[in-house]
Amino acid sequence: MRPEVEQELAHTLLLELLAYQFASPVRWIETQDVILSPPVSAERIVEIGPSPTLAGMAKRTLKLKYENMDAALSINREVLCYSKDAREIYYNFEDEVADEPAEAPASTSSTPKVETAAAAAPAATPAPAPAQTSAPAAALPDEPPKALEVLHTLVAQKLKKSIEEVSPQKSIKDLVGGKSTLQNEILGDLQKEFGATPEKPEEVPLDELGAIMQSSFNGSLGKQSSSLISRMISSKMPGGFNNSAVRGYLGNRYGLGPGRLESVLLLALTMEPASRLGSEADAKAWLDSVAQKYAARNGVTLSSPTAEGGSSSGSAAVIDEETFKKLTKNNTMLVTQQLELFARYLNKDLRAGQKAQVAEKVISDTLRAQLDLWNEEHGEFYASGIAPIFSPLKARVYDSDWNWARQDALKMFFDIIFGRLKHVDTEIVARCISVMNRSNPTLLEFMQYHIDHCPAEKGETYQLAKTLGQQLIDNCKSVIDAPPVFKNVNHPTAPSTTIDERGNLNYEEIPRPGVRKLTHYVTEMAKGGKLPTESKNKAKVQNDLARIYRIIKSQNKMSRSSKLQIKQLYGQVLHALSLPLPSSNDEQTPVKETIPFLHIRKKSVDGNWEFNKSLTGTYLDVLESGAKNGITYQDKYALVTGAGAGSIGAQIVEGLLAGGAKVVVTTSRFSRKVTEFYQSLYTRHGSRGSCLIVVPFNQGSKTDVEALIDYIYDEKKGLGWNLDYIVPFAAIPENGREIDGIDSRSEFAHRIMLTNILRLLGAVKSQKASRGMDTRPAQVILPLSPNHGTFGNDGLYSESKLGLETLFNRWYSESWANYLTICGAVIGWTRGTGLMAPNNIVSQGIEKYGVRTFSQSEMAFNILGLMSQKVVDLCQSEPIYANLNGGLELLPDLKDLSTRLRTELLETAEIRRAVAAETAFDHSITNGPDSEAVFQKTAIQPRANLKFNFPKLKPYEALSHLSDLRGMVDLEKVPVVTGFSEVGPWGNSRTRWDMECYGEFSLEGCVEIAWIMGLIKNFNGKGKDGKPYSGWVDTKTGEPVDDKDVKAKYEKYILEHCGIRIIEAELFHGYNPEKKELLQEVVIDHDLEPFEASKEAAHEFKLRHGDQVEIFEIPDSTEWSVRFKRGTSMLIPKALRFDRFVAGQIPLGWDPKRYGIPDDIISQVDPTTLYVLVSTVEALVASGITDPYECYKYIHVSELGNTVGSGIGGMSALRGMYKDRWTDKPVQKDILQESFINTANAWINMLLLSASGPIKTPVGACATAVESVDAAVDLITSGKARICISGGYDDFSEEGSYEFANMGATSNAAKETERGRTPQEMSRPATSTRDGFMESQGAGVQIIMQAKLAIEMGVPIHGIVGYVSTAMDKQGRSVPAPGQGILTGAREIATKTPLPIVDLKFRSRQLQRRRSQIGEWAEREYLYLEEELDAMKVQNPDLDLEAYRIERINVIKEEVVRQEKEALNTFGNEFWKRDPTIAPIRGALAVWGLTIDDLGVASFHGTSTKANEKNECDVIDSQLTHLGRSKGNAVYGVFQKYLTGHSKGGAGAWMLNGALQILRSGFVPGNRNADNIDEYLARFDRVMFPSEGIQTDGIKAASVTAFGFGQVGGQVIVIHPDYIYGVIDEATYNAYKAKTAARYKASYRYTHDALVYNNLVRAKDSPPYTKEQEKAVYLNPLARASKSKAGTWTFPATLPAESDISKTNETTRTLQSLTTSLTNSNENVGVDVELVSAISIDNETFIERNFTDTERKYCFAAPNPQASFAGRWSAKEAVFKSLGISGKGAAAPLKDIEIISSESGAPEVVLHGEAAKAATTAGVKSVSVSISHDDNQSVSVALAHK
């Protein structure tokens, strides 16, 4: 055959084969047999295609089938592939290389050897060189990258794993773990890289795939790898360190050729830095690490650069500095001349800056000298101390007394109930007075409601609360129109210092003997002390002598010598008076004189201040009246400085507030702690009409003094007040400074305590004068002191106090008497103040000398008495000098006395300590060293006990009050919450609850949050010391951490990095609000310098900018040069300071890996999906479900639904899609799917559930979670699902934060900081200063389940979802505007009379009657069935009557169930629906026997925005009012977002979780940021705003409301789970308790295992059924899972074929007897059907009247007592009917008909009494009965035999 014919035939064959391959079914096996078998027996087979796919199959076929035959026939076959074996196919063999001749022997001549490889370079002239240079490293033999390298790298890079983590023995399909999108991405990258890939490359192991692709691989990197390398270098290398620099560095340093360079850069792709490297040194260090790793992987040794010339080259050439200067001198001169030439041309003075600097230096030196002088004169402390701090922005206003009154009254009510207040003591009286001072009509209604509804029958404490509460109400009514008063009822106290046997010195305040109350105190003060007459009169004598001396001295006619003699005599008399009085043994009692401890002095004619009895009497009368009746300061305005905690000033502020004054108090240490102190002070003492304003203020600053008074008096920018009182008590201590130690601090203290007090008074005078306020002078309480240098060592303190006394004279001599009045208070020894606290221990000793010391409250009472109206009136006539010194000035040598007393105490204590030590030593010697151990105290440290408790289940007897609910609700239509959890700023729901309730973590909470944040981990093994250890260890150090030490060790860090705080960049991709990045378009006006880029990037620049960019290929490089030309537009990043820099963030260190989520999932999904996964698993575990597949034991896979939703979805994914993709950053290819809101639901199902039930994905902005609950409840009640996962989630992001700010919706952190707010305070719902919501992030999830299923499974029930609804609002143009659509939940038409249907008892009666009717209908149907069977038999003799009977019985039974459910809906679950006279909320509560008054808590959406709280409070108050909530029954308002911030989609879920925790605990958490409630909200009197947690005696129901942007409103009402248990019988309840206990143990173990092994989330690898079972499981509604031997839940191989209800049952057998009996004339038949739910076994009267003791014992012992009683009751009724006798009415007892069990267990009838007589009369010889009952009904047939 000619060659051309062969060629033509081959071509035809090829075409035919290709056509056959593409157009026909694949029959390659047969085709191979034709080709390989005779007669063809092809020996050379060539595959034309991209990879050897068919060739590989042919090789395997040859080996399996033809290998032996070919060997026998000597056939040598060849299988080739076009893409791999082109050289063999075309016979392109290389020529053989001729053998090289053997190397000649080495020459022995001296002729130098000539190298042929390259000519020697000519020697160059040496040039100046650095001290040391490096030569390039020795070249490494080059080797191009292999296809496997490229393949391996691309796969690892896409999987975001290191090269070691990707096994080359695995296929792409195995590596991606079923992620089809990721697989497609990799295949696309390979296609882009290699051009062509084999068929199905994803199924071939990487090493095999690499080998296949190697044949066609040319050793050069393709587009994909080149692009990745260029992108990595441009995005991660420092500026200027481009592609060429990278390659040059690696080549020079390690001698790498082009091929190995590519390999190293490939490896670098799998080691890419997380962020751009900061410097070239960092970049080189990173490249070094890559190169070393490459060398280790490839088994090569990298050489390092060597010093040039090596060790034999000698020293490197070095040039000296002088020579270098000479060489460069001419160049420097030339450049300088050119610079000066250019300057002259531009008319610029090059020396202008230096000249200006000289002038500035003169000025600077002058100012510096002045500043140095000022600092030298005043000192550093003074200089820093006078800095102003006043800011009106930071003013805190507290005036919501109306709210705190209700809070205090309620707290007192529960304190009595819980036994914390058992007796009427001073504490309870003081609290009652405080409540009375705030009496108002709303408060009276509030208290009256609680007292009227206080169940006194519950115990003594309830009775006491009711009694005392009513007394308090009566007292409040009596003072409602009276002004508030300050009345101190505390016991006066005395100092007590004791020293115990061991030498411990103890000081305490004890009740003062004989002085029980303040009236006794005033009497004691009036009596004064009893000192000897001589001592008392000594001062008076001295004064009188001084006056005589002055008169004599004034005589002009007296000689000089006489005057001198008189002067000497005067001095001698004074000296004699100063001597101590001689002791007397005279038995006569000396005469004693007294003056009051507190008295008023009046200035005498000669200018001395003398005791004035009249004024003192007036003052003491005021004190006595104040002690009895109180003092009012209503409508008074006061300024108080120096009122820190523990000071007299703080006590004065308390008194002023209690008396109704408005007070400005200043503080020099403005902080949250300080403002919280004043806020709590106002909360306790603020009375009706009072107001407290706290401002930062430095009394040492003149600026602050003026600014403060301007603020107080300015009507527009300030308060617009007119002060009535000024109490300038600010001071700082100067201890330890004698006259030679007067320093900067002393001068500053003098400025505070004297100079600026005068300035402050002057400023007040100026303000009053400028406003014409001369008829209302302000009383100034001057803080005087008896210390006129007496103590010493106190700097200028005495001088400051003495200086104030000049105001007594200035009042007369200056012009401000009409504006200010002066009252000097000489303050005595006051125990416990900041200045006097160190002297407390000697107070008792001081008092023994007849002096009186005072407590802070006593001294404050003294001063407040000076501020009464009577004393104020006295001050307007003349300055008042009030001596409140307690006789201290009459005590000589006070300092020495104090020192002596202190020394005696300390010596006594020291002696006793020594004696105790000696005694202990003797005892230990005598009895052994351990003998005292039994007497020593040992502190027992609590250990953490992480319980994760389920709701507590009460004894069944405790639910007796709910017995009316029995059988009244269809539990199949009741949704309950069985588990919940969250991921939020405070960790999970348990740790958040700790903070919400108590403001701190419990020990258990602290351990758990420390684990969550990765601070501790569990360890079990050998510790660092080599000893076995099991427990917590520090994650960083590995050191053991005892759980009791966790709180002390980590709490500070935890609090700093949890909750609402300044944004932490590491949580948000490095986002820093201080440098919020934006882009601005800029057009360049000159050509830029060129830079390097890859070829692709260069052409992309060209495509975008056209002629405005030049690109050129760089010779000998793969890089291109790019230059942007003039006119190019660029987007240049810029930054601004963004003012929203605070947010609620998940705890720092929260790591999904710690919960067990695999790395590939973490890298794949959006962070919000991780939050939802963790929340879902925790919620399931909280439900007692440790394996979600267990659910399929009870339900079909189609009955588990998911309604989790979000407001926005995956924010990180959206950011990647839009921002990162646009900026050409690496982004995963399937990022789109992670941005979908339903993707989180998909991951829940794929990783955890494998459910096939309904899914709804709500998107309701901030109301998403409530919308989710609404959807879940719809699915449960409609029967579409029996279990639902509901919840919501959302993230915090830079983009969302910026846009919320643009809307003006969020809190401006910058402004809040200016106002002195900490990040934790910036969310303040319901307060008068709220100003925008605080964004947050996280997720919340609930497990909502059908109640019947929950009981059956034994899962815990946390609450009943009694009501849920969503609503839109009205027409408008504002999407975020708050609306009132959810008011429709209270819609109803009022009726004139109460509706009986709402009453549970009424509905119970109707339902009982309906059940009787259903039973009668069933009886008739069963009786008619026999007639029906006879008729059917006649019509169709071949009919299977037995099968027909079974089916008809089942139909009847199902119809009975259906009718009962219909009845339950009619009178139970849904009785209120579609009734316009019953509001949905009223009806939903009435189902459970509740009313609107039983709604205890309202959890508010409470976003901390102005509009929301006004609207939401209005909505709730309107709902409650419209539904008839009682006056005074204010609902507790819970505002959770003060703690968590606003997580948008997850907010409602967190609130619902909190509401469920409230139901479980009865504890209502307060809004701790509610420092002052908005006055506007006072109108909503049915809402209370607690700021502190309140432990109640139980909450029955709670409301949760949510308002979302976009017209979404929602409301959920959850009800206490006890009401579910009231529906079921005792046996069912006890069985449920047992199941729940078992589940708790499993959940407890699971949770602790998760903490130990970090495996909370245990992702599923497969569904619970096999691939073959999938369709069968979907299509069989009865398919249920079971537990395998391996402990997993799977579906059995054989699924149930028919329903259990279709099987023959007892009812069928029971009714079969009807056929025989109806045809027997000697038998009477009785049939009775009873619904199990109709039999009330809780009705003891019914049970006792109708059942014998034997029957009761039998039924109560049955597994289902109610069903057993129903069976016995139906049997009795059937027996009665079979007797055919007349009855005594429906109420007649049936006890005479007894049903007993025979030995075989069959029921037997025993007749007693009248029943036996009636049977005998009717001729009945015996009665037999058959009973059948299930969970729904009981059927009995009785036969009376005659």
Swiss-Prot record:
Phosphoserine modification, residue list: 604, 1412
Residues annotated for Mg(2+) binding in this entry: 1728-1730, 1828-1829
EC number: 2.3.1.86, 1.1.1.100, 2.3.1.41
Residue ranges of domain Carrier in the record: 145-220
GO MF terms, alphabetically ordered: 3-oxoacyl-[acyl-carrier-protein] reductase (NADPH) activity; 3-oxoacyl-[acyl-carrier-protein] synthase activity; fatty acid synthase activity; fatty-acyl-CoA synthase activity; holo-[acyl-carrier-protein] synthase activity; magnesium ion binding
GO biological process terms on file: fatty acid biosynthetic process; long-chain fatty acid biosynthetic process; mitotic nuclear membrane biogenesis; palmitic acid biosynthetic process
Residues at the catalytic site: 1262, 1501, 1542
Domain Ketosynthase family 3 (KS3): 1079-1616
Composition skew (Low complexity), residue ranges: 116-139
Cross-referenced PROSITE patterns: CARRIER (PS50075), KS3_1 (PS00606), KS3_2 (PS52004), PHOSPHOPANTETHEINE (PS00012)
CDD domains cross-referenced by the UniProt entry: elong_cond_enzymes, KR_fFAS_SDR_c_like
Chain positions recorded as acetyl-CoA binding sites: 1728-1730, 1754, 1764, 1773-1783, 1797-1800, 1827-1829
Modified residues (O-(pantetheine 4'-phosphoryl)serine): 180
Pfam families the UniProt entry points to: ACPS, adh_short, Fas_alpha_ACP, FAS_I_H, ketoacyl-synt, Ketoacyl-synt_C
Alphabetized SUPFAM superfamilies for the sequence: 4'-phosphopantetheinyl transferase, FabD/lysophospholipase-like, NAD(P)-binding Rossmann-fold domains, Thiolase-like
Oligomer status and interactors: [Alpha(6)beta(6)] hexamers of two multifunctional subunits (alpha and beta).
PANTHER family the record matches: FATTY ACID SYNTHASE SUBUNIT BETA, MALONYL COA-ACYL CARRIER PROTEIN TRANSACYLASE
This protein's name: Fatty acid synthase subunit alpha
Species of origin: Schizosaccharomyces pombe (strain 972 / ATCC 24843)
